């Protein structure tokens, strides 16, 4: 089994102490095990995760307090990628509505890429706390975008309420898409989230996404860009 001693360090040829890579490997193994168990319809428990990852229960608990914490960390990958994409877009001089459109595309690309894990995660024995972490983090992304478009904001409600409403819409459409594509996924078909992205953008306020009701929605183009950017944290773990 993998060693979980996070405090260990290793010596380099120059005599300096380098961070021990074992904790990162343990964390990566747990992430992979969670994705595989979810995709295989296996029951996701700490015991099952530890066995699949080849680590001890103690190793699991040295990284995560429980399934809630693990699921939150895995979902956080997507948001970290979204924040990074936002910084890159800002540095490149993109407008705020361009950033918003790509934020939705990042969400759709993540769901498309990890649909098996996310579909399985719906059945995890996690608590309401996980849902609150998810919605809170998603809402924070919308808050940052809304703050950067003061001239576009409606007179009411406030930014926080708007962000929660936008988040709720995203989650409803994502959940519906996961359920609607379940049969195709089980048949081994390659899924395409272009329609999901188009629906999310079509139902978002036009003042927020910068597209009028009659304007074409470049969902395929946006999703293609998001796919290449976020071959994302999943490949880093």
How does the language model describe each region?
Residues 126-152, 157-172, 195:
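Amphipathic alpha-helical packing segments from all-alpha helical-bundle domains
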């Amino acid at each position: 089994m993998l060693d979980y001693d996070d405090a260990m360090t290793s010596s380099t040829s120059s005599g300096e102490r380098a961070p021990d890579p074992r904790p990162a490997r343990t964390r990566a193994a747990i992430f992979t095990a969670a994705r595989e168990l979810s995709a295989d319809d296996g029951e996701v428990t700490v015991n099952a995760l530890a066995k699949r990852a080849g680590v001890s229960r103690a190793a699991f608990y040295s990284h995560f307090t429980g399934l809630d914490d693990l699921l939150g960390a895995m979902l956080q990958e997507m948001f970290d990628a979204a924040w990074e994409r936002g910084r890159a877009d800002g540095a490149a001089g993109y407008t705020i509505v361009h950033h918003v459109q790509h934020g939705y595309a990042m969400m759709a690309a993540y769901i498309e890429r990890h649909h098996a894990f996310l579909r399985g995660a719906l059945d995890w024995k996690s608590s309401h706390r996980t849902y609150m972490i998810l919605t809170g983090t998603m809402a924070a992304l919308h808050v940052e975008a809304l703050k950067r478009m003061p001239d576009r904001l409606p007179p009411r409600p406030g930014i926080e309420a708007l962000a929660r409403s936008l988040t709720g819409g995203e989650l409803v459409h994502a959940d519906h898409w996961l359920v609607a594509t379940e049969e195709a996924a089980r048949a081994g078909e390659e899924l395409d989230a272009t329609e999901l992205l188009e629906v999310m953008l079509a139902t978002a306020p036009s003042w927020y996404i910068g597209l009028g009701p009659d304007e074409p929605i470049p969902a395929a183009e946006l999703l293609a860009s998001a796919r290449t950017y976020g071959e994302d944290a999943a490949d880093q773990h």
